Each structure stands twice: as C-alpha cells, then as structure tokens.
C-alpha cells in the first residue's frame, strides 16, 4: 500500500503497489489541486489497478472517474445489506493446480478482486467469506482481516449447504443478503447497486442477461428434442439478493419436499414467490475454464485502459483552468 503526502512519487513506485491509498492534507491544498493530484496519481497507477480506491474529498465527477465505490455507491436506504461470498469450490473444470478462486488474474488472486470491490462499499454491513480453513491463512487475505465486516464460514458439501453456513454468519437484523460466487470477479458496482434496489422493492432479485445463443433441448444427449424460445430465456448470474428469512424458508421447503435446486433464487421460485430479473452485464462471466481466464484478463485490461483515458481527459480539463 502506497500513501501520498504532499508530492507525487515516481511512476515505478506506484507500479509496485497492488492498490493505492491517497492520504492528502486538505488544509494545505485547494479542492482543485486535490483533484489534480488524485487524477495524476490514478493515471500513474497500472491499468490493472481498476478497483483502486483513492480516499479523497473531491467532486462527484472526479470520484466517479477514480472508481471510488465508497464515493458513488447508492445502496437502498433503510436496508441493512450483507454479502455471502462463496469461495469453497474446487473448480475441477479449470484443470489447474489450485481452486480457481486463487488463480492469478492480472497479478492478483481472483478472490482478491472480489474482496477489494466488496469491502470498498461502505453500505455493506458484513461480508461472510465461505472458505475452507486451510486457505484462510493465505498471505493475500491478511490485509483484509483488519476489516471487522469480514467474517468466515466453512463450506458445505453442496452449494446449498455453503449458503446456509454463510447465512448463519450475517447479523440478525440484516434485511437483504447477496449471494455471490467468488468465481465472478468482474461484477461491477453499478450492477450490484441495481440488483440491491430491485431486491429492496421486490424482496428477491437476480442479475441476469438475455440468452444470446439458440438453445436446444435433448433428452438423451444424442438427438434434439426441441428448440427453446430464446426470447424467454435468461442467463442467470450472481449476486442473487433476497430477504434472509425468505431464503431460509425456501431451503426448509426444498429440503422437506426433497426438491433439487441449482441456484439460490430457485428455492424462492419453488415457494411461488416472484423473483425480479435485474439486467446485468455480459462481462460478468463465471470463471470456469482456462479460456475464461484469458477473456477476464482482456476485460480488465480494457477497463483499466478506458479508465486511464477518461482520467487523462479530466486532468487536461483541470489543467486548462486558471
């Protein structure tokens, strides 16, 4: 972690840091100068540092460009929001030497991208990280443990068991809980905000995108049974956000009736409750195969480059002012 106090450091110092924290002296600088310094430091940061969170009091426009989630997050008022972050999978289809949530993605473990984003959102009351005890001492996790909002839970045999264990870790007065796969590190703050807003209004919401490919059904894996109507099909993502008690009741109902569920909102559907579809982003892919890792790196690099171009334009505008 690198701190700025007065004069900007050189480029190579910034590029050695994983994240950037600006500790400025407001009494000695005007708001305009603070904005210039923040923009300059953000520009010097590597393009992969997309989720760097500068702590600076500046204009809303500057804060948005700096991608400071705590500055722009707008979670529902009068709601206590928590996350259950599922990081207990083995990722066998990735064919790697370790679970996919610990694979390197542009110099950081996949799970680190998740945590940096979620812990930067001030409106989140608690984050329950569902992860095996053997991985909780990994070096990159140490810097997050000082945040009192982060607690741990043990994975279960199945996804449902892991979610239930995670639910046990949220506060009793939590009103909305988001279930999120650690293997989806590309989710954006905007998508999270919109899904929370829909869940607050409808009690259950899930990120989803319209299905692009033509989907055919087969009952034997050899011949086509029928072609499904693509206009009615949605590709479901995470986070999936619900009222905690609704989710608990859904699990009880599914267990009693021995119903198979494939995701979290399915248990709500089985009780006849409506689930709001929040239109997400196609870039919020789940890392499942080696090819997905390549795509994810490309997306992150593109985001970083676009961010730096926007920052450069903002900086030029500030420098032209008298």
Model regions and ranges:
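N-terminal chloroplast transit peptides
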Residues: 22-23, 31-58
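N-terminal mitochondrial targeting presequence
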Residues: 45-77
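N-terminal glycine-rich phosphate-binding loop and ensuing alpha1 helix
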Residues: 75-134
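Short, charged/polar "capping" segments at the starts of alpha-helices
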Residues: 134-140
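Short phosphate-binding loop-to-helix
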Residues: 143-176
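Conserved core of the sugar-phosphate nucleotidyltransferase
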Residues: 186-278, 318-322
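Left-handed beta-helix
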Residues: 294, 298-322
């Amino acid at each position: 972690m690198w701190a700025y106090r007065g004069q900007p450091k050189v480029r190579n110092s910034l590029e050695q840091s994983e994240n950037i924290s600006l500790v400025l002296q407001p009494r000695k600088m005007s708001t305009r100068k603070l904005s210039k310094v923040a923009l300059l430091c953000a520009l010097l940061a590597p393009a992969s540092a997309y989720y760097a969170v500068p702590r600076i009091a500046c204009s809303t426009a500057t804060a948005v460009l700096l991608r400071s989630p705590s500055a722009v997050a707008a979670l529902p008022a009068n709601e206590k929001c928590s996350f259950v972050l599922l990081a207990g999978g083995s990722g066998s289809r990735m064919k790697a030497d370790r679970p996919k949530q610990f694979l390197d993605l542009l110099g950081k473990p996949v799970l680190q991208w998740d945590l940096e984003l979620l812990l930067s959102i001030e409106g989140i009351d608690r984050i329950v990280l569902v992860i095996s005890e053997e991985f909780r001492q990994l070096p990159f996790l140490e810097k997050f443990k000082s945040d009192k909002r982060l607690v741990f839970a043990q994975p279960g045999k199945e996804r449902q068991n892991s979610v239930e264990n995670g639910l046990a870790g949220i506060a009793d007065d939590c009103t909305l809980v988001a279930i999120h796969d650690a293997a989806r590190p590309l989710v954006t703050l905007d998508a999270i905000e919109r899904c929370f807003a829909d869940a607050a209004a409808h009690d259950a919401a899930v990120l989803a995108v319209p299905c692009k490919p033509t989907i055919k059904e087969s009952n034997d894996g050899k011949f086509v049974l029928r072609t499904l109507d693509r206009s009615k099909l949605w590709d479901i993502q995470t986070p999936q956000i619900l009222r905690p008690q609704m989710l608990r009741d859904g699990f009880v109902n599914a267990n009693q009736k021995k119903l198979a569920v494939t995701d979290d909102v399915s248990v709500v559907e089985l009780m006849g409750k409506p689930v709001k579809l929040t239109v997400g982003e196609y870039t919020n892919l789940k890392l499942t195969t080696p090819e997905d890792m390549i795509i994810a790196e490309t997306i992150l690099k593109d985001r970083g480059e676009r961010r730096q171009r926007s920052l450069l334009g903002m900086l030029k505008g500030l420098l032209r002012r008298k």
